[in-house]
Amino acid sequence: MLVLVVAVLAALVGNARTKHVAGSAVRGQVPGPPSVGECLLESPGVAVSGAFGGDPSSGYASTDGTGYPSLRLGSCSGRPFGEVAGVVTDGPDRRRSYQEAWGDPSSPESQCSDMVNAYLGTPEDSDVPPQWGPAPSSTLVLVGPSDLQRADGQHWLGCVAAGVDGTGMPTGYAGTVHGMMRTLRFPPELAQCLAVQPSTAGVTAVDCGQPHKAELLAISYADDSRPVQPDDAERSCVELARSMTGLAHPTAAGRIQVRVIAVPLPPDPNTRDTSTANPTQWYCTIEPKGDNVLTGPLLGVGDGPLPVR
């Protein structure tokens, strides 16, 4: 028996000897920069989301580009966290302070911001009041090459339009953010749901999955130099509600109502410019009638079930 065991072990050891194979190793292909329209497939996290996040006193990018996170990008499927709006060649190849990064219109960071605005379809400011700014939004996330890509000599900076929910947290979403500021067709996950209607105390955003009283659609600002007429605000808010919810009629057969709220702001004590007197924040909102509450977003609800209880 002992002789048999030793023989078997000897055979195994013999088979485990290293075999020499002719030829030379060939390095696999290193992925290049992302393409416009590719998707961010993981959450960017709180620390790296936001165009102006970070420590203003620190440099944004080191000489090897390690100042920006390398996040997983690829073909869009499921619920992405963002979309590549553009790529700046040799973006993170020099160290920049916060002021250098965002104070210079030609900096890679500022270029990224412009690319994201173009990708979202952000319109130019209108001279016709009220100038409504949609409440659903996206944030700029800057993405750098991976360690392997940097070793391959890549120094690009990816400009990602990332989704954020009403509380400002990164979120996955259905559909696309491409052109949403122009078409007013927003992923419902970007809705800004409110515990109560806006007031002088401000706006209290809540998770849209919990019962809430209202949903904020858009915001506008007015003062004596840019006055807003209540009738114009009401009419334009109703049109916004129709476009943003996808409802044929924004009252949904009397179950919900569009509501415009004007909240006076304190005057600026540091200016003598009388044209800025009577500053007012205007809110375009939508809410259920009576004592009912919303149990989900109305944003993009279309022909789906109305989230009213």
Where are each of the predicted segments found?
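Hydrophobic membrane-insertion alpha-helices, especially the h-region
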Residues: M1-G14
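Primary mode marks residue(s) on the alpha4-beta5-alpha5 output face of response regulator receiver
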Residues: R17-R309
